[in-house]
Amino acid sequence: MQKSLLAIAMASLLTPISYLHAQEVQTNDTVVVTANRFEQVESSVLASISVVTKAEIEQLNVTTALDILKTLPGVEVNSQGGKGQISSIFLRGTSSKHTLVLVDGVKINSATAGGASLGLIPAFAIEQIEVVRGPRAAIYGSDAIGGVIHIKTIPANRQTKHDANLGYGNDDHSSLAWRSSGQLNDSTQASFVFSDEKSDGYRVNEVAPSGDSHGYQSQTLFGSLRHEIDDAWSVQFNGYQLSSDVEYANQFSGVKNESNTDFYSIAGSLNFHKDNYSSQLMVSRSDNESWDGVASGMVAKTALFSSRNSVSWLNHWVVVPALTLAAGVDYDQENARQGGANATNYSKTEKDNKAAYVTAHFSKNIVTAEASIRSDDDSAFGKHNTWNLGLGIAPSDYVEFIASTGTGFKAPTFNDLYWPSSGNPNLKPETSKSSEVGIRSYLPFVQIDISAYRNEIEDMIDWAPTGPGGAWTPSNIDNAKIEGIEIEALFETGVIEHRVSAEWKDPRDKSDDSFLIRRARENFSWVSTYSADRFGFSAVANYVGDRKDSTGKTMDAYTLLDISANYKMTEALTLGARVGNLFDKEYQTAHSSGGKYYVGEGRNWFATVNYRF
């Protein structure tokens, strides 16, 4: 990448800011847990991290987790159509399966495909989102080559409150939701969220007949119960359930198909905290059942069933005020099988992984440092070790210099290893080496984070023939190098708050120097919000650069503008409205093997009524 790139990027952000009145930006030291699997304030985290709070989500009036994520630096969301359709999250240009996704501490990545589905998680249910960019495999193991996304639905405070929410929009888009949380007694607190949503949708692929639409319906449940046994011991239970029916177009024929999914996860933990030591033993289980096929008629659908059983024991010691140690062990057992119209099953239906890790965090005076090491033992490919090092130097209260380096890996999925007649049980894990340098500046009128990163991924799994004229099978054939620069700036102009993020990246396939598919080289986001006693307004502009697809076609760059407003009629009743794609921009999100484009949604609107008591 050109050396002038960073200078140009900094100039583009700093030039308008120099004319602002010097007013202090409030930097809230939010408590986070995702970066190192223990609680710490956000400013002490050396990894690049973004945190979105409940208040910020409500200001934007968005409906899904993906709407929130696409405004953050380093996050690119690609959907094959509208809400509920297949979506990919490219964290710093890595594949969707390279991002670990947690919901209330429980992994929801698919055991069969590797990625995670976030398109139907309602924003109404979310209390906080933490996004850690850069590899965290030395702490979490497989799936965290690109980073970690942690969605939290359990409120941190104990205030009793209830929310009833109704929404309606174009394409007969409707939602009904309820949220309750608070104290059941002096030692027990609980939370509950229910959401029911449906829409007729729109024509998501040009191959579909004119007049077709592809809708969805979903029901979502979240729940938690925490009981404090005494001052040191507590137990917690939490769960997540999703049932959905999503229509989509067959990429070759255009015939309307339907995907029916039932997913649930449940977790229980025993927690101990006394003085400088804390420990958590968590047991969880998740199950996923999906059926795919023609939406109408008598044709049988194919089915996939998968489950994951997990046990984690985490320990955290504050040795001295400057030094924190953490260590833990993880065990995961995954199962998968096929059914319905699938005539044959996976060649193997079970695999497991055992792991142990240790991490240390040191902070004193101007120096912050961290180190982590982890060893995984996978039944499919054996042992694999990963590590991570980070260093921060803060010569003043206004600036901190950060550098980090580490390794990661992605284990082959069930589909890669054991798919009937084409799985490859000899696959190795994909591996990565990454490095990052950054500057965090806390000036009186602006907060700026600048990061430059490089991630090299080897033994990437892709389809290839076993030999001349041979059968095609997943193989360790690809290598990739992704370099990029991220900038995020927080500042105020009068009563309006701004969050501007920009990313320039160079995601390349090292075998032929081509660009990785569906990744833009430039992404920009500008979020502006205004809040008064009763009225709030927000505007979100997103620019996505041009992208190439596997078919060789290029999707043009596009810019979308979304606006929203809230009006608090009483202390309890709030009205909200949002218009997405305000200027009705036509754009493509992918090019299918059938020769047609997946298209994004045109101008759309959604209005809500929320009653809180």
From Swiss-Prot:
Q: Which domain of life is it from?
A: Bacteria
The molecular function GO annotations come to: ABC-type vitamin B12 transporter activity; porin activity
As annotated in the record, motif TonB C-terminal box runs over: 591-613
Residues in the signal sequence: 1-22
Domain TBDR plug span(s) in chain numbering: 41-154
Identify the HAMAP family for this entry: BtuB
Query: What name goes with this protein?
Result: Vitamin B12 transporter BtuB
Q: Which organism is it from?
A: Vibrio vulnificus (strain YJ016)
